[in-house]
Design a protein with these regions (language model features):
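Short, contiguous strand/loop micro-motifs
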Residues: 2-3, 161, 185
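Long hydrophobic alpha-helical segments typical of transmembrane helices together
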Residues: 169-191
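GST-like fold's C-terminal all-alpha helical module
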Residues: 93-176
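Short, hydrophobic secondary-structure boundary micro-motifs
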Residues: 77-78, 108-109, 165, 184-189
Length: 191
């Protein structure tokens, strides 16, 4: 199996952590340079990372890749509450990615514009919801939802996207998992 993706992507990192201890090859791509982009385009018409290549089978999207891996590796199925938690994590991550790309494209994402306002609103609401879910005992295991939350929080800090001081429970959650297997090895700060 090969996992194609960028070192910094939280969607890629979550799968690298899920695959800790499993036989696979990570192929690091810089999707903003022609060589990495060319490899990505050969495998995924949506031009997004991650991509899993397992023999002749090619899978796109971190959620779909996880379902494939869960079936292949016999992971415990996710509950509906866990699926909802993942949806919340993914919504926050997607909005942060959109704003980061807009900012890198020269837009002032603090302008009072509908698109930017909706992203900021979603980010705030999802972070509040995730903080409450941790307080309620969710994300207690180091499984796909917990790993996905960890990679989101750590990526926010890495990219300095949101001030997380108002979310002490999220910060505590992240800090509690820093010594997990492969966390240090997959840290985007090291690339």
């Amino acid at each position: 199996m090969q996992l194609l993706g960028s070192v910094a992507s939280p969607f890629v990192r979550r799968l690298r952590l899920v695959l800790a201890g499993q036989p696979y090859q990570f192929v690091a791509l810089n999707i903003f340079e022609s060589e990495g982009r060319s490899v990505l385009v050969q495998h995924n018409p949506a031009r997004k990372v991650p991509v899993l290549v397992d023999g002749e089978q090619v899978i796109f999207d971190s959620g779909v890749i996880y379902r494939y891996l869960a079936s292949k590796l016999k992971f415990k199925p996710l509950s509906w509450d866990q699926e909802n938690g993942l949806t919340t994590i993914n919504a926050c991550t997607d909005s942060l990615v959109e704003l980061l790309l807009c900012k890198r494209s020269g837009f002032d994402v603090t302008e009072d514009k509908l698109f930017f306002n909706l992203q900021h609103e979603r980010i705030q609401a999802t972070l509040e919801a995730l903080e409450q879910q941790i307080r309620a005992g969710h994300f207690g295991d180091w499984d796909y939802p917990g790993i996905s939350l960890f990679t989101l929080i750590d990526w926010i800090l890495f990219r300095d996207l949101v001030d997380l001081k108002p979310f002490p429970v999220l910060l505590q959650f992240r800090n509690a998992h820093l010594n997990r297997p492969m966390v240090a090895e997959t840290d985007p700060r090291l690339s």
